[in-house]
A protein has these predicted regions:
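Glycine-rich flexible loops
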Residues: 1-169
Length: 169
């Protein structure tokens, strides 16, 4: 008999790469992700960002002060770890700095989507641990990092150290 994790691993292996994006480029995929997030109520401008790790060591990201429903492929910018814009209009959100720490800690991570869904934000303010109470949440069971203390805006290296350490392997 297979263990539960073995079943989960097998399912995700079979499901990987089943979506056909045709000839869509990375910027188009970022823009589509933003539109999907916006359609689900994630209308971030300052407190949410997406980054994608590129093979050349640079990153695609959404610019500061643009809501997810405003992002199109032309507004996606390419940056380096020094937050310098290498391609595209706009300024990177300083909060993406913590993404670099995660990418260094976890070579398997290729994309980070950081949002503040209203319901999740509300639940987090209760100070109570979240409980897996529905079968749709079971893939996250024992695979979530929880931070008891938070130093504030994630714009410095301290936040990246805390987050990447909490994620572990």
């Amino acid at each position: 008999m297979l263990e539960k994790q073995d079943h989960a691993d097998a399912f995700f292996a079979r499901s990987a790469n089943k979506l056909d994006f045709g000839n869509w480029g990375e910027k188009e995929k970022v823009a589509l992700s933003c539109r999907i997030l916006a359609s689900e109520g994630h209308s971030e401008t300052l407190a949410g960002q997406i980054t994608v790790r590129k093979e050349d060591g640079t990153f695609l990201t959404t610019p500061l002060a643009q809501a997810f429903d405003e992002i199109d492929p032309a507004s996606v910018i390419r940056i380096n770890e020094d937050m310098e814009v290498l391609e595209g209009p706009g300024t990177p959100n300083p909060a993406v700095r913590f993404h670099f720490w995660v990418y260094r800690q976890r070579p398997d991570v290729q994309c980070i989507i950081h949002t503040h869904p209203p319901h999740v934000s509300t639940l987090s303010m209760t100070g109570q641990p979240l409980v897996v109470a529905h079968m749709d949440a079971t893939p996250f069971h024992n695979d979530c990092a929880h931070l008891k203390e938070w130093p504030g805006l994630p714009i410095a290296d301290q936040e990246g150290e805390i987050i990447s350490a909490a994620l572990g392997d």
